[in-house]
Amino acid sequence: MGRLGHDLDFTTDARPDDTEAILRQHTHATWDIGRAFGTIGAQIDDWVVEVTTYRADAYHPDSRKPEIVYGETLKDDLIRRDFTVNAMALHAATRTFSDPYAGLTDIVSGILRTPFPPERSFSDDPLRMMRAARFTSQLGFTVTNEVRAAMTDMASRIEIISAERVRDELSKTCLLYTSPSPRD
């Protein structure tokens, strides 16, 4: 997508304590601010690395905060992602590509859709609607009719998101603009 960063995200069946022990074998710069969500971070050379245990979260309808439930499989973890374009994984050791929700096809086609019904996805985390708008404006994606309808019908759900998270997403949308070109 023409954007290189210095961060790597991993997901694993290892629990946070095990992940932290493994990371400490490679660096002393680790942090566990996301431990409650199953995430351990580390600085390895020039890379910021975050490793999160597979999750299969449960959400209360009046809150954006999930009840953290560790998952058992990669596929279960990927289905909880915001969009299919973010629901792909590469097994680091075997280099096996996992794309159970056709995210690569959606990238090539410039389509933004959710791994499961958008009403559930946006109910779980209403900020995803704002992320859809950002991906559309910055990366040139087109949302599916189902995603657009869910965004329209569920716009009021944004009210349960903290003002800080809304501000941060708006800042990303307005300040990090690049010309749309998801398939270039």
PLM regions with names:
Residues 1-182:
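Catalytic cores of the polymerase beta-like nucleotidyltransferase superfamily
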